[in-house]
């Protein structure tokens, strides 16, 4: 299909459309153990190994982008994602014979400009991130269907408006009339009240080396927006809103988190959502770079739920599905000839110990914070295995402080970045009594919200990234990562009935990635 498409390029080019092809190959190999527990014991005392995955991983991907440029005012773009293909895995085309079908459309949009104005519009499947500073967006950085328009009032001030539709018409309704899938409102017809829509305004202001972009976003989600399998099982390429928008710590009905016994239905047709942010970047005092970012989020309750206390069937509490909180992060760097030293930190609100008023952790749709590259989304934002990064991209319910030496270079074409960061929790230890096991704290790892940290818990992360630029468009990236586990056993190994236990361990990774860009 792709070959046939590109063969058509010369004929179309003769009609004054300039086709441009760009892309990149990634080949990744790694060794890792990314589970924070070595063994767990369930409520019956059975010892279970936590990680049965191979320690060695090898996979590849290809991103291929085709731009059809008619003029500076009109163009179209399509990006294909071939892979990721795990080497040796047949369904992904990685086994002997290599005939698997694993081609996806990553982006497909058009850019156009209103004549004689500065108004530029992009519409279609595209990547869009809310404005951020100090290491990525803690709220929203996602590909999907949207329209955004930008206008420059002058060289210093502009305005961007955006409509984004993450989900619609995924609820199958009648397929769950007996409730076997655990869907709520299963008397509703298929496709009824199942859309999620987000609307945002951004005001970028740049003056004298200072950039400030205040923004606000309002959203609505229908009461059936979460009622489909991919949402509930977090089976998305990007984002896990079943976890990051809700207070449960897990996919609804998925276990591992709050000890929920029943999800209440709601008579509401739609629930509201709201976020606001203020990212600031200051480069006035060169060689200093100062950045900070403050975010707030709120998701309206869409029904209540019942949760056991201390795993006791006779002690049931009623909880709210509301989630509301804030997060602030900052970065200060000083550029030197041989390196750029920097300190960074963050603080996010945490749960107060009660489920009655919902969660006090900041909600998000698809966060990608990259202050670090093991727990976060740093470095290449890709790895030989999905567990090698993105363990906690939201930072909700945590605080931390770190130090880094970035872009160190002692040999031509070879750079290094060293980073150390301490992660602490801001959630009340009283929340443990609502969990379904002593190891529920790890239920959100790899689901964008990392281990659930109380104020008694901590993690210490180390990153070492080495990049060798062999050619202008080809580099070799070697990364080592380690996270020391300081989860508090006294807090989590409570003597609850059938609560289980665990043996904690540190996690580590070593990955080697070859990247060719053209």
Task: Give, region by region, the residue ranges found by the protein language model.
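Secretory-pathway/luminal and periplasmic proteins that interact with or process carbohydrate-rich
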Residues: 66, 131, 352-354
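C-terminal outer-membrane beta-barrel translocator/porin domains of Gram-negative envelope proteins
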Residues: 320, 342, 348-397
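Beta-barrel outer-membrane channel/assembly domains of diderm bacteria
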Residues: 3-128, 147-161, 203-208, 214, ...
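Internal, well-ordered domain-core segments that constitute the primary functional module
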Residues: 120-226
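Active-site beta-loop-alpha junctions enriched in small/polar residues
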Residues: 26-28, 164-166, 217-221, 295-297, ...
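Acidic/polar loop-and-plug regions of large Gram-negative outer-membrane beta-barrel proteins
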Residues: 176-189, 197, 213-266, 363-385
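Short, solvent-exposed loop/turn and secondary-structure capping segments
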Residues: 34-36, 89, 134-135, 172-174, ...
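A charged, solvent-exposed segment within the mature domains of Sec-exported extracytoplasmic proteins
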Residues: 308, 328, 343-346
